[in-house]
Amino acid sequence: MRIKICGLTQIDQAQAIAKVGVTDLGFICVQKSPRYVTPTQLATLTEALPAHIGKVGVFANQTLSEMLAIISQGNLTTAQLHGDESPELCQQLRQQRPDLEIIKALRIRDRRSLEWAKQYETVVDALLLDAYDPQQLGGTGHQINWDDLRQFNPAVPWFLAGGLNPDNIAVALGQLHPDGIDLSSGVEQSPGIKDLSKVQALMTALQAIASQPLHA
């Protein structure tokens, strides 16, 4: 299972978190976000990370040309589209950067929101389900109703996000079986500043889950 920590802004924290067993680190490329990093900061952050760590840029309602420039400057391996991007834009991005992993985030209000997934399954590499918030695009701490996701079985891998933290991850993974998890505010002191003790608590909880007979 992929483990993604999102909203990094500090080099020392990114390097420390990269060592504890996560697979991907996410960086917010949306200017209105309190976790925003500039393209120059992004390049500095990604250059400091090991090659095996996925470097995910999070975008929202940005132009194709803007995304391509940031992806190139930031040496990103993955683009996560967290706004209202169309399947057509996803396809255009894939045509321009066939080497790039594309994740489409869907902001889930209720079970009906899951129907949007079908539109993207043929044009992205993975989906990410986050809780809907009218004011923020992510990192809200709001939780999806997990009961709505029990039958979710898309044709591509998917990440569970939305209010996950070290205290509820075992319950979440006891009910659902995503291909990856994504945490931001659940392992923070404040927006963009991670709490390394919470990240370690998350990894400890995941190790305990993995050691259970059902997951062995």
UniProtKB/Swiss-Prot annotation:
UniProt entry keywords in alphabetical sequence: Amino-acid biosynthesis, Aromatic amino acid biosynthesis, Isomerase, Tryptophan biosynthesis
EC number of this enzyme: 5.3.1.24
Pathway it works in: Amino-acid biosynthesis; L-tryptophan biosynthesis; L-tryptophan from chorismate: step 3/5
Protein name (Swiss-Prot/TrEMBL): N-(5'-phosphoribosyl)anthranilate isomerase
Listed Pfam families: PRAI
Residues in coiled coil: none
An example Gene Ontology molecular-function term: phosphoribosylanthranilate isomerase activity
PANTHER family: N-(5'-PHOSPHORIBOSYL)ANTHRANILATE ISOMERASE (PTHR42894:SF1)
Similarity section: Belongs to the TrpF family.
GO terms (BP aspect): L-tryptophan biosynthetic process
Reaction catalysis annotation: N-(5-phospho-beta-D-ribosyl)anthranilate = 1-(2-carboxyphenylamino)-1-deoxy-D-ribulose 5-phosphate
Originating gene: trpF
